[in-house]
Regions:
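S-adenosylmethionine/decaboxylated-SAM
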Residues: 2-9, 16-169
C-alpha cells in the first residue's frame, strides 16, 4: 500500500495508490523528472517524491497560489455532498499567503522545486520533456485542452500524462 502523508489536501487512498502505480513504471530508470501543475499545499508532489525515493528524481510543481476557498455551500448541496465534505473543504481553506508559506514548509529538504505562477500553454518550462506530467490544475475545459495539446507536443514512448479529477470534456 502506498505511503500517506499528513499534508492538507484532497488525496484519498486510491490517489496514493495511483501515484505509486504510475511511479512503479519508472523505478528502473537512471533519473526521473516530474512536472506537476496544481500544487495546492504539496500533498501530491510529496506523494510522488515518496513513491520515487529509490531512484534519482526531481519534481517541479507549479501553482498560481491564490489561496483556496472551495465550492460554495450551494454547490455542495446541489451536488448532494454531505457535511463531511463541507468539513474537508473548511479544513483546506487558505489565503494566498498561507498557501504559499505552507507549500514551502511542506517541500523543505526535498528535491522539489515550486514555481508560483499560472500554467498556460506556451509557458517557458524549466523542464523541457518531463517523464511524468501530473495535471491537477484548474480543471477548466480550456486548461485541460491545453495540457493535452502540450502533452501531444512532448510525448514520446515511456512518458506518462496523469490528469486528476477529469470527469468529462
Amino acid at each position: 500500500m502506498a505511503q500517506h502523508n499528513d499534508i492538507r489536501g484532497w488525496m484519498m487512498d486510491g490517489d496514493y495508490n495511483a501515484i505509486e502505480k504510475v511511479c512503479s513504471e519508472f523505478l528502473n530508470r537512471d533519473y526521473v523528472e516530474v512536472f506537476e501543475i496544481g500544487t495546492l499545499y504539496g500533498k501530491s508532489a510529496i506523494a510522488f517524491d515518496d513513491a520515487l525515493k529509490t531512484v534519482p528524481h526531481h519534481i517541479t510543481t507549479m501553482d498560481v497560489c491564490e489561496g483556496w476557498i472551495g465550492p460554495s455551500d450551494e454547490i455542495i448541496e446541489m451536488l448532494g455532498l454531505d457535511d463531511n465534505f463541507k468539513a474537508m473543504r473548511d479544513a483546506n481553506r487558505s489565503t494566498a499567503e498561507e498557501q504559499f508559506d505552507e507549500i514551502h514548509t511542506n517541500i523543505l529538504n526535498r528535491d522539489i522545486t515550486f514555481i508560483d505562477d499560472k500554467w498556460e500553454l506556451g509557458y517557458d518550462y524549466p523542464v523541457v520533456s518531463p517523464d511524468i506530467v501530473f495535471y491537477d490544475g484548474s480543471h477548466s475545459y480550456v486548461e485541460t485542452r491545453d495540457i493535452l495539446q502540450y502533452w501531444s507536443e512532448i510525448a514520446v514512448e515511456g512518458k506518462v500524462l496523469v490528469i486528476d479529477d477529469l470527469i468529462g470534456l
